[in-house]
Amino acid sequence: MSCKLKVKGQYIKDLSFENPNSPQIFLMISKTPPEINISINVSSVSLPVKAQDQSSEQPSDNKVEPLYEVTLQVNAEARVGTTVAFICEIKYCGVFSIESDDVSIEELSQQDIRDVLLISAPTILFPFVRELISRVTSTGGFPPLMLDIVDFRAMYESQMKQGVGQNDNSQDPEK
């Protein structure tokens, strides 16, 4: 089954940078490089959209194109020993619609939708998050933090095997 995402918009939902131990931390990191811990989470929700809410480019057959918000959350914390150097947290979102050349959107399986929302969508959003974190850490007085590329498919599959799953509410806007 071939699903394609259409990006309808993307934005920063939440961005925080803390530099709680400045200026002393700059002397500390000149002697000892900080240890950096990064966590990444992906979630999606179905957006409640009414037919009249959509733009005029919508076909006139009164079908509603489902929209989904995907959130890529990255938390980075740098420490020198037990001293916090910085904490950077971002929630970066994209609003997407899903298309398929093979079948109508109603005929797509839950798994196909989940895969495209939790693998393909964060892959699209990641370069923007990576650049924002690099800029914010640099503006905070630290060397730019360049995140390694993330294999969202491997991350998703690993979490599914562990039974953890990602926070996916893509089919139930009430969650």
Curated annotation (Swiss-Prot):
* Compartments where found: Cytoplasm
SUPFAM superfamilies per record: SecB-like
Transport is among the record's keywords = yes
Q: GO terms for CC?
A: cytoplasm
GO BP term (any one): protein transport
Question: Per its UniProt entry, which superkingdom is the organism in?
Answer: Bacteria
Q: Give one GO term, molecular function aspect.
A: unfolded protein binding
Subunit relationships: Homotetramer, a dimer of dimers. One homotetramer interacts with 1 SecA dimer.
What HAMAP family has UniProt attached to this entry? SecB
Q: What does this protein do?
A: One of the proteins required for the normal export of preproteins out of the cell cytoplasm. It is a molecular chaperone that binds to a subset of precursor proteins, maintaining them in a translocation-competent state. It also specifically binds to its receptor SecA.
Give the protein name, as stated in the record: Protein-export protein SecB
